[in-house]
Amino acid sequence: MTMDNPKVEQAGHAVDSAKLKQLNLAVDALEKQFGKGTIMRMGDGSAGLTVQAISTGSMALDFALGVGGLPRGRVTEIYGPESSGKTTLALHVIAEAQKEGGITAIVDAEHAFDPSYARKLGVDINALLISQPESGEQALSIVETLVRSGAVDVVVVDSVAALVPQAELEGEMGDSSMGLQARLMSQALRKLTGAISKSSTVCIFINQLRDKIGVMYGSPETTTGGKALKFYSSVRLDIRKIAQLKDGDELTGSRTRVKVVKNKVAPPFKMAEFDILYGEGISALGELIDLGVEFGVIKKAGSWFSYGTEKLGQGRESVKKILREDPVLYQKIHMQVKELMTGHTEIISSPTE
């Protein structure tokens, strides 16, 4: 007659001591073979329950994403029509990462990087790593090497549509190359996602839209590079220009809407709107006014805006001018809005737009 194995308390549950011993032996063997951290209990505190993020440079979009920005250790896809603000948004993420002391890189497959524009958005050009690869294979190999180094905080690939497979480059004009790019992306992402997760890198793929032929019902729009990027992305952002901004007859920017169409780290399908000004990027002042009104920090009556008992001015442009010239007032309003949005306050520098 044999006695039952004694029970051991583990996380409030009784576990068979013999099973626990076998489990510990298995874990030790796995860590010896594959390294420390190969397998861990979620309750150990080292399993990464908290999602770390890098700000997008937009308070509204950070709020819509649910974790305060783009998640580290994940793949993000930013897509939309031409001139919708895709690269602008990615450059703002780079600028925010650099403010925190992060190392950033851009793989410019389009060979169209504008350093003067990036500088206007707050990017430190001298600290930015840039590569202009000749083929899609070279571009993705560069991304893999940067990610596996564990030293890079943000890698931007601009864009997926420009990742031309080597076989297509070596072929003649008019040669069929159907499926080559999709296979390239699928193979690369299978290798990249694990490395990205371990390195805590924000990996951004900028993508373009194409029209599917012969679609009678539903949206004819699709992104380039096959379905792999849609599958492996933890966050997908659909960015669109919804209105033009004018100062008299002069076009000064565009009203932009971003929809979080996929989000594995928070509830999806939330939206954010902000102004993108030509030559300046996301308007922090305009966004603060909009969010202030939305959360009741700033009162709006007709075209007049007020803060508490103080009248700020008539029209958004006059209020922007007042906030630009009064950093203390800017900070007060920003802290109140931030507190209402996320439950905590954070001091940031006043913008100089």
From Swiss-Prot:
Alphabetized GO MF terms: ATP binding; ATP hydrolysis activity; ATP-dependent DNA damage sensor activity; damaged DNA binding; single-stranded DNA binding
SMART domains found in the cross-reference section: AAA
Pfam families named in the record: RecA, RecA_C
Gene3D superfamilies cross-referenced by the UniProt entry: P-loop containing nucleotide triphosphate hydrolases
Any one GO cellular component localisation term in the record: cytosol
CDD domains: RecA
Source species, domain of life: Bacteria
Keywords from the named record: ATP-binding, Cytoplasm, DNA damage, DNA recombination, DNA repair, DNA-binding, Nucleotide-binding, SOS response
Compartment list: Cytoplasm
GO biological process: DNA recombination; DNA repair; SOS response
Chain residues that bind ATP: 80-87
DNA damage as UniProt keyword: yes
InterPro entries: AAA+_ATPase, DNA_recomb/repair_RecA, DNA_recomb/repair_RecA_CS, P-loop_NTPase, RecA-like_C, RecA-like_N, RecA_ATP-bd, RecA_C_sf
Matches recorded under PANTHER family: MITOCHONDRIAL DNA REPAIR PROTEIN RECA HOMOLOG-RELATED, RECA
Function recorded in the entry: Can catalyze the hydrolysis of ATP in the presence of single-stranded DNA, the ATP-dependent uptake of single-stranded DNA by duplex DNA, and the ATP-dependent hybridization of homologous single-stranded DNAs. It interacts with LexA causing its activation and leading to its autocatalytic cleavage.
Family to which the UniProt record says this protein belongs: Belongs to the RecA family.
NCBIfam families reported in the protein's UniProt record: tigrfam_recA (TIGR02012)
Protein name: Protein RecA
Biological source species: Chlorobium chlorochromatii (strain CaD3)
Gene: recA
